[in-house]
């Protein structure tokens, strides 16, 4: 009886439940030490030597593994080429296999944005040109400026983490300040500036679905560049498509999968597949390259 109910479940609801369960599991695996939110301690065990595929602050009290962007900036700032190659290799390998499916299923900050986006207020679409800002952020704050500073001075601060990252504020700085009086007393101008950025991002995510993913995330920029070649991809069978527009209408990233099945913005969430009345959309590791254009 239970199995028959699951099989007959509305495909849109089924997709939402399945995806949310995966997101929650990924969030839980990445943040196993929830008790540290009370004590204010950080986990510093062996698992912190490894990166999570998604964006999750190293300084989050619950974090079990490291943030790939934070790790990349940390080793770049010390000119540690061996470890830097490891982090880049990890990101490129994950991106080549999954592309931005990481953003859709495995990123803790992505889950937070989805929860904010589920609040029933009017949603708006951003001009497409703003989606290119994240590539500027990646180039300037993660790659070019840190590299130039290391070459010139032998050291570089983790610029993106220090000056922009709202995930670091929400998951790391704010919880730590709540549990450490000394940190609260020493909070300066930079803290309040970053708190302002966090508030703007949170408010923006209420009205623009996945705002941070679209505009500011350097990790999404890296995976997005690999979306066109990733093994896990979206395919549209245009012989079945009736151009009803339901797929583009439900996309949280404002992608038209019929026109751009391998868009750098697509997070492979499966919403378009679930809503398609003709089953024209598939997502997986198949040989769908010939069907997708």
Residue ranges and their predicted role:
Residues 1-254, 258, 264-293:
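Non-ligating segments of multi-cofactor redox enzymes
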